Design a protein with these regions (language model features):
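Local cysteine-cluster metal-coordination motifs and their immediate loop/turn environment
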Residues: 57-73
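Flexible, acidic/Gly-rich N-terminal and inter-domain linker regions that tether
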Residues: 1-54
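A short secondary-structure junction motif
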Residues: 28-32, 65, 74-75
Length: 202
């Protein structure tokens, strides 16, 4: 292909040629403001009482910084910080869950950060807290993001026993040079072992 054959859509380039937030959530970060107070929150909660709930739990912790990562994160190897975070999360859940009484959870997703930063006891603690405060549909999708650098095979068994039935694995790239450049080096064989074990346990 010669340079003359390349079509440049200048309008499209100009439309997106600026720094802005990545689309990682809805509403996007720019939609949040101090103007959205408690009363507005309560009105939003009451707006669709017949709809099932989709819950997202953010686990911000990582053992190591990935250079490409733009979401909220705390890079630490101090495991007790996760316990402190779960303490705060418990207060928020106990305070807010009654607002959703009578509504069933059809989806739960743990994202991060690195949700598998949590140890087995912490995973069980959080799942128990969620089940005690929300009503889950029998066929609810319960998913988690898995970092293959931050998990052992037996943790998959623990996640399955806790009710997780879906996972997404953050491999990002198999190219070793790319992995080095983004500070996310990982064992390819172990990734496939994780995938195979996940299939085995359903």
């Amino acid at each position: 292909m010669s340079v003359q054959q390349i079509y440049w859509d200048l309008a499209l380039i100009q439309k997106y040629n600026y720094s802005g937030p990545r689309y990682t959530s809805y509403p996007t970060a720019l939609e949040f403001s101090e103007d959205f107070g408690e009363q507005a929150f309560l009105q939003a909660v009451a707006r669709y009482p017949e709809r099932p709930l989709s819950l997202y739990v953010h686990i911000p912790f990582c053992h190591k910084l990935c250079y490409f990562f733009g979401c909220n994160k705390i890079v630490t190897r101090q495991q007790h910080k996760a316990d402190q975070y779960l303490d705060a999360l418990e207060q928020e859940i106990v305070h807010r869950a009654p607002l959703f009484a009578g509504r069933h959870v059809s989806q739960l997703h743990w994202g991060g950060g690195t949700p598998t930063y949590l140890n087995k006891a912490q995973i069980s603690r959080l799942m128990k807290l969620l089940r005690e405060n929300f009503q889950f549909n029998a066929d609810a999708e319960i998913s988690i993001e898995v970092d293959p650098r931050e998990i052992e095979l037996d943790v998959l068994d623990h996640l399955r026993a806790e009710g997780f039935n879906r996972l997404s694995m953050g491999v990002q790239d198999f190219n070793k040079e790319v992995q080095r450049l983004v500070n996310r080096e990982q064992d390819e064989e172990f990734i496939f072992a994780l995938l195979n074990h996940a299939r085995e346990i359903g």
